[in-house]
């Protein structure tokens, strides 16, 4: 009632009078204090104070934290100190040399080709030379490589080569010239969306691999965030999410906020909730995550996405073409992971892994075209005409798209279900046996094809070195120290799993004869990298690896653990 409202206002009148009295006193004090200054001085001080506030704000509120920038500056200054700096440079130089010496792929018996041949070679001669190069490849056919090659069957290879040949000269940049290729790509996207239970509005693009698929999703959500007025869009992702998200943040001027994992290696949903801010542009889940092969709880994270109206990307690059067939293969997953989950707005899945397409093929999917639109680039003002491309590349190899389509059509649902059944059966067998080997343990509860190992009794990198000496290839992991092995269709062949377990047991037994021995070779290099506080040093040393990929100079090779040369 009006009368009641007036009574309430009168109750506050004494407090308003007190507030007015204090504000008048404050105003008079400031005016009196400023009388000794000239107007130009007041203006100058106001400008300087404003600039100082802006400078402090920009110093503190940057994509990279103040503490991180302080550490970088500190380490940079330390490296410039005469004695300490020289010592660090000596150690860095030694680490670089050790890294080069322990790269078996640099061992070549013949000279590099450094100039074009004066006369072109005939077809037979070119193919013969190529066979020399392919003979350098490791023994992946024996099933000793972690991941890398997901099928490799000769008949499938022949099909993919023929499919590529049909579209060798085609380019999806020119759909008017290659309409058949456009149809192939559209069908790949639609088939993949259907596998992940996308609705009629779902859509996507074919990319060159999982990294590009992730980059495209991040680019889309960055542009969406910028449109909403977010100046520094943030990616909130688990610590285990792929490094491609760091790459996207680096490329696109975003900030990545890493969220801690629980003991079972799943993302801590409550920690993710606390990490959400007004700058959050996207949330991330992995199915599974690369390091430990553990599935993140997509439904729980999706609830956060819906509540805070934030896009959620599910990274299924590694296991995408396993998880969609798990139920029909007799290994149903506990939780949904695809577009059936409200809040999931995009998914990435690599067709060149368990889709058995050739390398250079992946799909990024969206629940609705409104998200994909932000992925596109359109240059409307170029003299060469309107330039529009769906992903990073302009020209793309049509042969890869054709071969991807061929793989999908060749396997069909029944083929993928059978392949999934064989892989998961092998992975579960290995998991159960590894759990019973003393002195090592498995991280989390991997449900798919990746098994990560650790040890409380010895440096786990020694196990990788020992297995490497037996011809096996593991992936080194860090934070915490661990190694993993990724099971593919190659490992389902007869006796591969049995030999794997035999070599693991022998290696662990050998290591436990002297569990405190130091790691050598690549294991020592990875151990040093994890222990180094200055991560810029690690990046500097790691760049040597990339430089070595392009070297055409002979390199002297070192030894693996215990002086055992890695077999060719």
Curated annotation (Swiss-Prot):
The keyword Nucleotide-binding is assigned to this record: no
Mutant lacking the gene: phenotype: Mutant animals have a shortened lifespan. Mutant mice show an increase of sphingoid base phosphates, but also other sphingolipids (including sphingosine, ceramide, and sphingomyelin) in the serum and/or liver, resulting in changes in the levels of serum and liver lipids not directly within the sphingolipid pathway, including phospholipids, triacyglycerol, diacylglycerol, and cholesterol. They are deficient in B and T lymphocytes yet have high blood levels of neutrophils and monocytes along with elevated expression of pro-inflammatory cytokines.
Membrane topology value: Single-pass type III membrane protein
Cofactor: pyridoxal 5'-phosphate
Keywords, in A-Z order: Acetylation, Apoptosis, Endoplasmic reticulum, Lipid metabolism, Lyase, Membrane, Nitration, Phosphoprotein, Pyridoxal phosphate, Signal-anchor, Sphingolipid metabolism, Transmembrane, Transmembrane helix
Positions of post-translational Phosphoserine modification: 564
Subcellular location field: Endoplasmic reticulum membrane
Lumenal side, ranges: 1-40
Top-level taxon of the source organism: Eukaryota
Any one GO BP annotation for this protein: vasculogenesis
Reactions it catalyzes: sphinganine 1-phosphate = hexadecanal + phosphoethanolamine; sphing-4-enine 1-phosphate = (2E)-hexadecenal + phosphoethanolamine
Its EC number(s): 4.1.2.27
Entry comment describing in which tissues the protein is expressed: Highest levels are found in liver, small intestine and thymus, followed by kidney, lung, heart, spleen and brain (at protein level). Also detected in stomach, testis and skeletal muscle (at protein level).
One Gene Ontology cellular component: endoplasmic reticulum membrane
PANTHER family: PTHR42735, SPHINGOSINE-1-PHOSPHATE LYASE 1
Protein name (record): Sphingosine-1-phosphate lyase 1
Organism encoding this protein: Mus musculus (Mouse)
The organism's taxonomic lineage, starting at the top: Eukaryota, Metazoa, Chordata, Craniata, Vertebrata
């Amino acid at each position: 009632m009006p009368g009641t409202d007036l009574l309430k206002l009168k109750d506050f009148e004494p407090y308003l009078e007190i507030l007015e009295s204090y504000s008048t006193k404050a105003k008079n004090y400031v005016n009196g204090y400023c009388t000794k200054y000239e107007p130009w001085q007041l203006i100058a001080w106001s400008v300087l104070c404003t600039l100082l506030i802006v400078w402090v704000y920009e110093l503190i509120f940057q994509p990279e934290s103040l503490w991180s920038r302080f550490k970088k500056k500190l380490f940079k200054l330390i490296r410039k100190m005469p004695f300490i700096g020289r010592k660090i440079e000596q150690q860095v130089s030694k680490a670089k040399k050790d890294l080069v010496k322990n790269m078996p792929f640099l061992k070549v018996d013949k000279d590099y080709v450094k100039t074009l041949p004066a006369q072109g070679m005939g077809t037979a001669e070119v193919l013969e030379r190529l066979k020399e190069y392919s003979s350098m490849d490791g023994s992946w056919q024996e099933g000793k490589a972690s991941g890398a090659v997901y099928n490799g069957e000769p008949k499938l290879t022949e099909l993919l080569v023929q499919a590529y040949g049909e579209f060798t000269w085609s380019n999806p940049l020119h759909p008017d010239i290659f309409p058949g290729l456009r149809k192939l790509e559209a069908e790949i996207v639609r088939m993949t969306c259907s596998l992940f239970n996308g609705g009629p509005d779902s859509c996507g693009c074919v990319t060159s691999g999982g990294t590009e698929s992730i980059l495209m999703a991040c680019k889309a959500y960055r542009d969406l965030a910028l449109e909403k007025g977010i100046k520094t869009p943030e990616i909130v992702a688990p610590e285990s999410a792929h490094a491609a998200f760091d790459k996207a943040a680096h490329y696109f001027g975003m900030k990545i906020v890493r969220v801690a994992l629980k003991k079972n290696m799943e993302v801590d949903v409550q920690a993710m909730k606390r990490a959400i801010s007004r700058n959050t542009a996207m949330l991330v889940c992995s199915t599974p995550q690369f390091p430990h092969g553990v599935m993140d709880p997509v439904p729980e994270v999706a609830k956060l996405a819906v509540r805070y109206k934030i896009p959620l990307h599910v990274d299924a690059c590694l296991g995408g073409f396993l998880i969609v067939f798990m139920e029909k293969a007799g290994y149903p997953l506990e939780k949904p992971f695809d577009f059936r989950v409200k809040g999931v707005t995009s998914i990435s899945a690599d067709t060149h892994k368990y889709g058995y397409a050739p390398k250079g093929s992946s799909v990024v999917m969206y629940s609705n075209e409104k998200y994909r639109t932000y992925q596109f680039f359109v240059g409307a003002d170029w003299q060469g005409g309107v330039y529009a491309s769906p992903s990073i590349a302009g020209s793309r190899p049509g042969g890869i798209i054709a071969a991807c389509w061929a793989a999908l059509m060749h396997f069909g649902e029944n083929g993928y279900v059978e392949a999934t059944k064989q892989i998961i059966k092998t992975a579960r067998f290995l998991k159960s046996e590894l759990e019973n080997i003393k002195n090592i343990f498995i991280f989390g509860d991997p449900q798919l094809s990746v098994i990560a190992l650790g040890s409380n009794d010895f440096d786990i990198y020694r196990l990788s070195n020992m297995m490497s000496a037996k011809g096996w290839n593991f992936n080194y992991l860090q934070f915490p120290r661990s190694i993993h092995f990724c099971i593919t269709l190659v490992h389902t062949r007869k006796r591969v799993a049995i030999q794997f377990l035999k070599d693991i047991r022998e290696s662990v037994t050998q290591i436990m004869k002297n569990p405190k021995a130091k790691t050598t070779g690549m294991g020592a290099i990875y151990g040093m990298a994890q222990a180094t506080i200055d991560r810029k040093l690690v990046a500097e040393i790691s760049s040597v690896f990339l430089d070595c990929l392009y070297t055409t100079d002979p390199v002297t090779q070192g030894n693996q653990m215990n002086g055992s040369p890695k077999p060719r």
